A protein has these predicted regions:
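Acidic, metal-coordinating helix/loop segments flanking the phosphotransfer/catalytic sites
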Residues: 39-57
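Receiver (REC) domain active-site loop signature in two-component systems and cognate sites
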Residues: 64, 87
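C-terminal output helix
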Residues: 115-128
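Two-component/phosphorelay signaling modules centered on CheY-like receiver
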Residues: 20-41
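Non-catalytic signal-transmission and effector/linker regions of two-component phosphorelay proteins
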Residues: 1-14, 27, 131, 135, ...
């Protein structure tokens, strides 16, 4: 079973695929993952759901109406507010050129359909762990910066290192 690294809330996974049977299969694969799931049915819907749902990870199909997965990925990775969302492209496209386009767009991972359940779950586990560790590292970095600036909980200025 894949468990989210963060204890404060369940991980959020957005499935972005316009094919209902594919969505159902991915949802079935995720039944043992402790997560909240949302579904987007096209590229524009994906961008809207990202804003509202704030996913930790997106399972992103490439060939969707209104905007391709490549374009969605590129937009998300170029935006400071969404660049840290993990993106796993799940697609029937599996030529070397397709993988290169996915990497150029900024994807964090790539799986070809038909998807192997264990392979997908391992990718998700690693990506969620990385996302949560990165979030915790950023939280600690901000805390240290506040302490150094004297704006932390003690509020008495920067500390001199002990000798």
């Amino acid at each position: 079973m894949v468990k989210a690294a963060a204890k404060s809330r369940k991980s959020r996974i957005l499935i972005a695929d316009d094919n209902a049977p594919n969505v159902e299969l991915l949802e079935a694969f995720l039944t043992d993952v402790e997560c909240e799931i949302a579904v987007a049915v096209d590229g524009r819907d994906t961008l809207e759901k990202v804003t509202a749902f704030k996913p930790d990870l997106i399972l992103l199909d490439v060939m969707m109406p209104k905007m391709s997965g490549f374009e969605v990925c590129r937009k998300l990775k170029q935006d400071a507010a969404t660049k840290d969302i993990m993106i796993l492209m799940v697609t029937a496209l599996n030529e070397l050129g397709d993988i290169e386009r996915a990497v150029e767009a900024g994807t964090d991972g790539f799986l070809s359909k038909p998807v192997n359940k264990l392979d997908m779950l391992k990718h998700i586990e690693v990506m969620l762990r990385l996302r949560h560790v990165t979030d915790e590292l950023e939280r600690l970095r901000r805390y240290i910066q506040e302490m150094e600036d004297g704006s932390g909980p003690e509020g008495d200025g920067p500390k001199e290192p002990k000798k």
